[in-house]
Amino acid sequence: MDEAEGNSEESGLIKQHRKEKRDLQAKIQSMKNSVPKNDKKRRKQLTEDIAKLEADLDVRHKEELEAFAQKQPEPTQVSGITNGVTSLDLGNEAPVQQPRQSKAQKRREKKAAQEKERDERIAEAEIANLSGARHLESQKLARILAERELQIRQIPSDGHCMYRAIEHQLRERGNDLTVANLRSQTADYMQNHAEDFLPFLTNSSTGDMYTQEEFLKYCTDIVNTPAWGGQLELRALSHILKTAIEVIQAESSPIVIGEEYSSKAITLVYMRHAYGLGEHYNSVELLDTSTENS
């Protein structure tokens, strides 16, 4: 590989890393917006998750740069050999000096050993996770859904998961309501039926029921931020869509919201341990048996 080609590859790699860092910062901002500032427990977990995401990206970038560097010729060693040959005194038959290992090479070898140790720890953690809460929950939900000839349809964890899961279900029925539509209609319905929702909303700092101003902000956040949706929002959506919404969970019986409606229920999957931030909603789809039969 000549020097120009090497520089071009290195420049491309650095540009890629910059883009990935920008993308991660956008994701982090979305994560921050999805957790209320007064929810100290989830904010603390959020800080830990963000730190892990940034650390993982930093480690991967270092590994990629290290791999790139190892593909390049070692200029110190080449020059060392050349200098040794040109300094030979044939008359005195001086011994040829062996090229010394550069400091950069020593650092790379030390780094490689550290990364190998880290990879081994990650592998051990992955094995341990097979008995962890997240894996057990996923396995149990898969069995529950398989009995209905269904499987989980993964939904991004971005604060919109509940609305995205419902959007997916509606599209399967020919309904083109979007996440933005669902959020807007949910907020409008809750504001127009405040007496049905206010008693269930309390200030996490004082324990008091929301004031009218706090309730208005809550509804405004539904529309303007990726605020996480829960049972109150599901209740509103059930009335808006005039459809029952069934929530399947691993550790207890399904919850059905809007049982008064007779149309086919929308089915969601509630996962308590799916992500570091906690609760998450997925959608469902027909079970794909092709992999089992292949």
UniProtKB/Swiss-Prot annotation:
Compositionally biased tracts (Polar residues): 27-36, 73-86
Composition bias type Basic and acidic residues, residue spans: 111-120
Signal peptide feature range: none
CDD domains per record: OTU_OTUD6 (cd22761)
Catalysed conversion reaction: Thiol-dependent hydrolysis of ester, thioester, amide, peptide and isopeptide bonds formed by the C-terminal Gly of ubiquitin (a 76-residue protein attached to proteins as an intracellular targeting signal)
InterPro entries the record matches: OTU_dom, OTU_OTUD6, Papain-like_cys_pep_sf, Peptidase_C85-like
Keywords assigned by UniProt, alphabetized: Hydrolase, Protease, Thiol protease, Ubl conjugation pathway
GO molecular function: cysteine-type deubiquitinase activity
Ranges for region Cys-loop: 155-161
Listed Pfam families: OTU (PF02338)
Active-site residues from the entry: D158, C161 (nucleophile), H280
All residue ranges annotated as the OTU domain in the record: 150-287
Protein name, entry field: Deubiquitinase OTUD6B
Organism: Xenopus tropicalis (Western clawed frog)
Lineage: Eukaryota, Metazoa, Chordata, Craniata, Vertebrata
